[in-house]
Every structure is written in structure tokens, then in C-alpha cells.
Amino acid sequence: MSNVFTHINADGNAHMVDVTEKAVTEREARAEAFIEMASTTLEMIMSGSHHKGDVFATARIAGIQAAKKTSDLIPLCHPLMLTKVEVDLEAQPEHNRVRITSLCKLSGKTGVEMEALTAASVAALTIYDMCKAVQKDMVISQVRLLEKRGGKSGHFKV
């Protein structure tokens, strides 16, 4: 792990990292997020009785769209040509929550960690948005990188 912030230059100013000379490699990142809610809210999602429609399908599409738009949201993030984005949602009724996992892949010069994190985050936010009419105190938590492969820094896994 490095002890240098790559997005801060010698003058202390934020800048986009120059990846021109970096090698193109296969890159992959996985992330997760959780959204906790009342059992009644989760049951509405699981039974398909939510008045706004299929919450998981909408959250999945939102997460995929968000991964593709990450560079528009994170100021110093490079625009990337993603080759795969996967968002999975798992109801965990024993914990009154939904686990969201994301996977992003590409062949490129920079990693896809931010895309994976953005996908999981926006999927969780979409669940919140769709369910806020029935519950406003849902909690989004534990947004984190699970695994990253490729590039100079190598393999990272929680």
C-alpha cells in the first residue's frame, strides 16, 4: 500500500492522474453495500407488493447506469470503457437488510474500484428512494471494496 495521495500534486493541488504511460491490463473490482430496513419494508420488496414496482430490478439497472457515469460524479475519476458491470441484490431477512454486490471489469490503464463502489452505492440509494414513502429511517452502511485485481498495485481482497 502506498503512503502517497496520487491525486495531489507537489504543490498540494488536486489533479487527474496521468495514465498515458501505464500498461493496459485486465482489471476487475468488487464492492458491496447494505441497506437496513424494517421487516415489513423488506417483505414488501420480497413479495413484489411494493407500489412502485420491482425494487430490485430498478436498483440493479440504477447501479449499472451509475457505474457507467462514475467519471461524471467523481471529479478526478477517469472515464472508462467498462466491459462488464454486474449488480446483485440479496434480501437477508434474518438481518432485515439487503446486501448489494457489484462487479466491474475492463481492459485498461486504470482501475475500476470507483465504478464498483458507485454501482453498489447508487443501487442502495435507489432502494432507499423507492421505499422512503413507507420507511424513512432505513440505513445504508458498510459500503466497501471487497476485491480488486490488475494493475501495478496487484491483487487486494478483504
Swiss-Prot record:
| Extent of the signal sequence | none
Note the Pfam families from the entry.
MoaC
Question: EC top class, in one word?
Answer: lyase
What reaction gets catalysed by this protein? (8S)-3',8-cyclo-7,8-dihydroguanosine 5'-triphosphate = cyclic pyranopterin phosphate + diphosphate
Keywords in alphabetical order: Lyase, Molybdenum cofactor biosynthesis
One GO term in the molecular function aspect is: cyclic pyranopterin monophosphate synthase activity
**InterPro entries documented for this protein:** MoaC, MoaC_bact/euk, MoaC_sf, MoCo_biosynth_MoaA/MoaC, Mopterin_CF_biosynth-C_dom
- In this chain, substrate is annotated as bound at 76-78, 114-115
Q: Does the keyword Manganese apply?
A: no
Q: Membrane-crossing residues? A: none
Q: Indicate whether Lyase appears among the record's keywords.
A: yes
SUPFAM superfamilies, sorted: Molybdenum cofactor biosynthesis protein C, MoaC
Which EC number(s) does UniProt give? 4.6.1.17
Record pathway = Cofactor biosynthesis; molybdopterin biosynthesis
Please name the GO terms of the biological process aspect recorded for this protein, alphabetically: Mo-molybdopterin cofactor biosynthetic process
Positions annotated as active site in the UniProt record = 129
Listed under subunit, the entry gives:
Homohexamer; trimer of dimers.
Indicate the family of this protein.
Belongs to the MoaC family.
Question: What PANTHER family does this protein's entry cite?
Answer: MOLYBDENUM COFACTOR BIOSYNTHESIS PROTEIN 1, MOLYBDOPTERIN COFACTOR SYNTHESIS PROTEIN A
Role played = Catalyzes the conversion of (8S)-3',8-cyclo-7,8-dihydroguanosine 5'-triphosphate to cyclic pyranopterin monophosphate (cPMP).
Protein's recorded name:
Cyclic pyranopterin monophosphate synthase
Query: Upper lineage ranks?
Result: Bacteria, Pseudomonadati, Pseudomonadota, Gammaproteobacteria, Alteromonadales
Q: Which gene encodes it?
A: moaC
